[in-house]
Amino acid sequence: MSFMLYLDKADFILSQPPPSNNQEKKKILKNRITNSFSLIMFSGNNCTYCQELKPIFKKLVGTIPNCQIGTVNVSLQPELAELSQQTTTPIRYVPLILFYINGTPFKEFGGNYTEDNLRQFVKEVSIKAYEIIGTPQQEEGSISQHSVGKAVSKRVCYLNFDNAYNGTPPPSFD
């Protein structure tokens, strides 16, 4: 039986990246799902786009092999959003969808929020993830940096106004 995972702050831990070249690296916010892939949606109570996305996200449960589907309501878990700010995956807007490999964030979804696009994203990223898992040179801390938000989209709800004008635009809902 498959079901949606409802996660909270206790389901996440901070991890130090491996040392390399004396560079100061950000911490990694990991989830505790360590035996598979996971697709996690960070949402908020006052985000109408999150509410529109939830039924689509729920349809994915049990349909993607070796991938657990979960959600975190950052309105109920503000400490988690705050904790994430100094990590490789800061939660600066919702909805935010991240793909994890054995609990480590790997890729942020940046496409249109449709069921087909989410499935295609997981399929493509899973293929890349399997390649990485089999590659011993891959360091745990060498995940891609996730950049967020220019105020070019009216289809996301920024958690901090100051962050609404930095970085790259968030994904669209078209």
Swiss-Prot record:
Signal peptide: none annotated. It holds the Pfam family Thioredoxin. InterPro entries: Thioredoxin-like_sf, Thioredoxin_CS, Thioredoxin_domain. SUPFAM superfamilies: Thioredoxin-like. It comes from the Viruses. Coiled coil: none annotated. Belongs to the IIV-6 196R family. This is Uncharacterized protein 196R. It comes from Invertebrate iridescent virus 6 (IIV-6). The lineage of its organism: Viruses, Varidnaviria, Bamfordvirae, Nucleocytoviricota, Megaviricetes.
